[in-house]
């Protein structure tokens, strides 16, 4: 059973996150291992496994990028384990330039420049995310997979910038 079915949701990117949360709570109550403490060893093991599956499904579907990756996996794109790289040279050059800029910001310890950088990267991420949503809505799986790969780069860059921000604030 796929994660969408487990939560009673249609297998599409845009989901009702409130329904996801409510169903998660229901499933957790229903399959919590403590409820099977007096059961047989097989029942206890099944409850632990079911609870782990529910938690994994919840973590996957509640985050936009992992939800997209999972949806693509249902259509034959295993982005989690693939060695496929982004072939868009202009995008890769842009990423190198942004990484260099982040390194320069770290060296200069320029808070204002870092704040501006984070906002710019967030705008880039949001634009790609919207592009990915449209591609998934239109079942453009190849294009969506490529956009997810690019979003991973931007997500890592954003995370690095936020870590630098925390580091600079600690001084």
Swiss-Prot record:
Organism: Salmonella typhimurium (strain LT2 / SGSC1412 / ATCC 700720)
Span of domain J: 2-74
Superkingdom in the source lineage: Bacteria
InterPro entries found in the cross-reference section: DnaJ_domain (IPR001623), HscB (IPR004640), HscB_C_sf (IPR036386), HscB_oligo_C (IPR009073), J_dom_sf (IPR036869)
Gene3D superfamilies, A to Z: DnaJ domain, HscB, C-terminal domain
Any one of the GO CC terms: iron-sulfur cluster transfer complex
Signal peptide: none
Record keywords, A-Z: Chaperone
GO molecular function, one term: ATPase activator activity
Family: Belongs to the HscB family.
Disulfide feature: none
Listed SMART domains: DnaJ
Subunit structure: Interacts with HscA and stimulates its ATPase activity. Interacts with IscU.
PROSITE patterns: DNAJ_2 (PS50076)
Known role: Co-chaperone involved in the maturation of iron-sulfur cluster-containing proteins. Seems to help targeting proteins to be folded toward HscA.
Protein name in UniProt: Co-chaperone protein HscB
GO BP terms in the entry: [2Fe-2S] cluster assembly; protein complex oligomerization; protein folding
């Amino acid at each position: 059973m796929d994660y969408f079915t487990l939560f009673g949701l249609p297998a599409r990117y845009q989901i009702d996150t409130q329904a996801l949360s409510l169903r998660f709570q229901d499933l957790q109550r229903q399959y919590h291992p403590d409820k099977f403490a007096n059961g047989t060893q097989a029942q206890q093991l099944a409850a632990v496994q079911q609870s782990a599956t529910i938690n994994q499904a919840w973590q996957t579907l509640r985050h936009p990028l992992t939800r997209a990756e999972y949806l693509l996996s249902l259509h034959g794109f295993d982005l989690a384990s693939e060695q496929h790289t982004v072939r868009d040279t202009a995008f890769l050059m842009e990423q190198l330039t942004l990484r260099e800029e982040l390194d320069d910001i770290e060296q200069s310890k320029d808070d204002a420049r870092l704040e501006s950088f984070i906002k710019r990267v967030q705008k880039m991420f949001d634009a790609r995310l919207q592009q990915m949503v449209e591609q998934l809505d239109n079942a453009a799986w190849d294009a969506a997979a490529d956009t997810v790969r690019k979003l991973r780069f931007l997500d890592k860059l954003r995370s690095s910038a936020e870590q630098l921000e925390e580091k600079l604030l600690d001084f």
